[in-house]
Structure formats: C-alpha cells, structure tokens
C-alpha cells in the first residue's frame, strides 16, 4: 500500500471540482484554471514552481493539497517506438500504460482497474481476480506521466499524445465515476484538450452503464464482442449471460445515436482457432451486425501458457475478413507492436496482467488511432 497523506489530490479534479476546492479554501475560482494548466499542461507537481500563483496561496496549497500521480515502476521503449510504463497505484497493485506511435499520431492505452472481475475465458487477467478501482487521479495520472515523459505540452500541434483509449486493465464501465472524470480532463482545454473523437472507451458490455454513458460524456465507443452468438459468447465472455447480444447491441446503438452525428461503433473480435473463426461464424456476424453502424477489428489471438486457445492460420483470418468485406463491412486485421518489451516486463506485472490482453489492446489501439482520420464514410456499413 502507498501511504495516504490526507491532502486533497488536485491531479484528478475536474474543472468544476477544482473551482469548488478553491471556494472551500476561500480563494477565487479563476485560480482553478491557473493551477490546472500548471498540472496538466506542464506536468508540475511542486506548488513553488507555479510562478503566477502568489506565495501566500502556494503556502496554503502546500498545507492542504498535493499533486500526486501513480508511482512509475518502470518505463520501457520497444524497437518500434512503442513505450510501456508499469505504475504502482495506492492499493499497491501495478497496472500498465502503453503508448503507440504511428506517423503523426500517438495513442495512449490507459488502465481503469487493477485486476478484472469479468473472467473472460481467453484472458488470464480475469483469472487473477479484481483488486481495486483506480481513482480519477490514478486514471488521468497515466496520461500525466506519459506527457511528462515526452516533455510535451498538450495544447501544441506537435504534442505526443493525440489519442487516448480506455483499453488497459479492467472494465472502465465498472469504475464509472472515476473514468468519466478522467475522460473529461482528457478533453478539457485546461487538461489535455483531446478531441472527443479521439477518446475511446472500450467495454465488454455493461449495458446499464452504456445507457448511462450518454448522460455524462460524448466519446467514441468500442465493444469487445469476440463471438457472433450468445451460446459462444457466454463461454468466452461470461458477462454475456447477464446482458445477451440483442440487449447489448441495442444499448450500443442507443448510445451511438445519442451522439447526434455520424459516428460508428468499433467492434473488437479476438480470433481463436476453431472456436470463432469459421465461415459460419462470419455469416452469423454479418447477420448480427446488420443494423449496427460499425467497423470491425479482427485481432488474432496471441497464445499464452495453459490458455487452451490457439491463433488461427493466416488463411482462416483472411477468409473471415473477406467474407465480412463482401458483406459491406469495413474490416481490418492488425499485428502486435512492442512485443520485445512485452516479454521483458511480463514477470513484473504477471500477477495483474497477461500477455494476451496486452496483445489484444496493442492491436486494437493501433487501429483505433489510425481510424479517426482515414476511414471514409462509404467504407463503413450503416
């Protein structure tokens, strides 16, 4: 456990919360914007470095507040430019944050929980069980740490982080309030100023919270589907027993239509040899998604010891992709980046992180990043 100081951590406060904090200590609300810029634009955690803040206020802040992100355990850089941070949160658990560069884009994959309670059969993270929800400061702190590492100012055109995906450890919708607060900071001009189209939340399908999402925020949505029928998805994603596909896809369509503009759902589909990669599965998927504006990411499974699953052949993957293409869907197949640092750090977070989920995230993150600007409307089934 990391000892708590009892002070208010300003790192995770939204603009509204920051203004209320300054009210509570008898200061003007405009101070909130000043301090937020120092924290998020310049990565400052020392109040004495906030030079446009009076000395008296700095002393007051030192007495009752702090700026504290997760503790960086390690930072590794792959030969392809991918970066991975292992960070320790207040519960004592470690989580991962991954940065994937691609041309002028830089996508950061952020964790929302330590461990996971969903127990998906092809993902050993769930087998470790759930440890804790991350605080808003620990979620946005991953962006803060990465930004500081690059020495990048968020508001500038050459900033390192252009996209963020909530696709790290955990189910974001099961840590709803903290994830919402962190995503607001990602998009706030006093925070990181990232476009709503470039912030993506990935979910396994917590239907009530998908319905709640549109009341609180407007971000892109990705669904971890992995099966084209309920019987198979019940095996792969046990959450499906509670929220079957018909109900789940209806909730996704409601959310997408609530955005009031032409946006599409991203479907993530991990391909498992002889499990969900056959022609009949592609045919079922075509029928399942016919009323859902979407694009599809096919993610070849990356085996890990004792998983019980294998990666399909390249021919099987291409055949599956071709069938979906012929039906009018925009479909991509992606390969992993950062494999060399994946292996190097696997043991460090072995109790809370597995190789398969990392592979799935790296691939999907890369595609989501590329998707923002390049996918023509005509190429997407609507």
Curated annotation (Swiss-Prot):
It catalyses: adenosine(2503) in 23S rRNA + 2 reduced [2Fe-2S]-[ferredoxin] + 2 S-adenosyl-L-methionine = 2-methyladenosine(2503) in 23S rRNA + 5'-deoxyadenosine + L-methionine + 2 oxidized [2Fe-2S]-[ferredoxin] + S-adenosyl-L-homocysteine; adenosine(37) in tRNA + 2 reduced [2Fe-2S]-[ferredoxin] + 2 S-adenosyl-L-methionine = 2-methyladenosine(37) in tRNA + 5'-deoxyadenosine + L-methionine + 2 oxidized [2Fe-2S]-[ferredoxin] + S-adenosyl-L-homocysteine. Its cofactor is [4Fe-4S] cluster. Disulfide bonds join 109-345. It is found in: Cytoplasm. Binds 1 [4Fe-4S] cluster. The cluster is coordinated with 3 cysteines and an exchangeable S-adenosyl-L-methionine. [4Fe-4S] cluster binds at residues 116, 120, 123. Keywords: 4Fe-4S, Cytoplasm, Disulfide bond, Iron, Iron-sulfur, Metal-binding, Methyltransferase, rRNA processing, S-adenosyl-L-methionine, Transferase, tRNA processing. Specifically methylates position 2 of adenine 2503 in 23S rRNA and position 2 of adenine 37 in tRNAs. m2A2503 modification seems to play a crucial role in the proofreading step occurring at the peptidyl transferase center and thus would serve to optimize ribosomal fidelity. HAMAP family: RNA_methyltr_RlmN. This is Dual-specificity RNA methyltransferase RlmN. It comes from Pseudomonas syringae pv. tomato (strain ATCC BAA-871 / DC3000).
């Amino acid at each position: 456990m990391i000892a708590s100081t009892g002070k208010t951590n300003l790192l995770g406060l939204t603009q509204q919360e920051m203004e209320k904090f300054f009210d509570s200590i008898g200061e003007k609300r405009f101070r909130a914007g000043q301090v937020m810029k120092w924290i998020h634009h310049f990565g400052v955690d020392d109040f004495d470095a906030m030079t446009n803040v009076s000395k008296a206020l700095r002393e007051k802040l030192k007495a009752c507040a702090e700026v504290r992100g997760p503790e960086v355990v390690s930072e590794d850089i792959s030969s392809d430019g991918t970066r991975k941070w292992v960070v320790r949160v207040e519960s004592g658990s470690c989580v991962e944050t991954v940065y994937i560069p691609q041309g002028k884009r830089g996508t950061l994959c952020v964790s929302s929980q330590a461990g996971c309670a969903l127990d998906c059969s092809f993902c050993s993270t769930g087998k470790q069980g759930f440890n804790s929800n991350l605080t808003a400061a620990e979620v946005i702190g991953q962006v803060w740490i990465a930004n500081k590492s690059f020495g990048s100012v968020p508001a500038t055109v050459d900033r390192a982080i252009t996209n963020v995906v909530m696709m790290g450890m955990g189910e974001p919708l099961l840590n709803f309030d903290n994830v919402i607060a962190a995503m607001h900071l990602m998009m706030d001009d006093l925070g990181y100023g990232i476009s709503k189209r470039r912030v993506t939340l990935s979910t396994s399908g917590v239907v009530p919270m998908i319905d709640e999402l549109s009341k609180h925020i407007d971000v892109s949505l990705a669904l971890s589907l992995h099966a084209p029928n309920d019987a198979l998805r019940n095996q792969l994603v046990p959450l499906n027993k509670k929220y079957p596909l018909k109900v789940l896809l209806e909730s996704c369509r409601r959310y997408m239509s609530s955005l009031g503009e032409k946006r599409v759902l991203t479907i993530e589909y991990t391909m498992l040899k002889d499990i969900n990669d056959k022609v009949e599965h592609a045919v079922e998927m075509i029928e399942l998604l016919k009323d859902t504006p979407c694009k599809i990411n096919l993610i070849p499974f990356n085996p890990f010891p004792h998983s019980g699953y294998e990666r399909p052949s390249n021919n099987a993957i291409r055949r599956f992709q071709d069938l979906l293409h012929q039906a009018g869907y925009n479909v991509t197949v992606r390969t992993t980046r950062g494999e060399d640092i994946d292996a190097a750090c696997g043991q460090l977070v072995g109790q809370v992180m597995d190789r398969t989920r990392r592979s799935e995230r790296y691939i999907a993150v890369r595609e989501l990043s590329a998707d923002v600007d390049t996918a023509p409307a005509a190429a997407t089934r609507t």
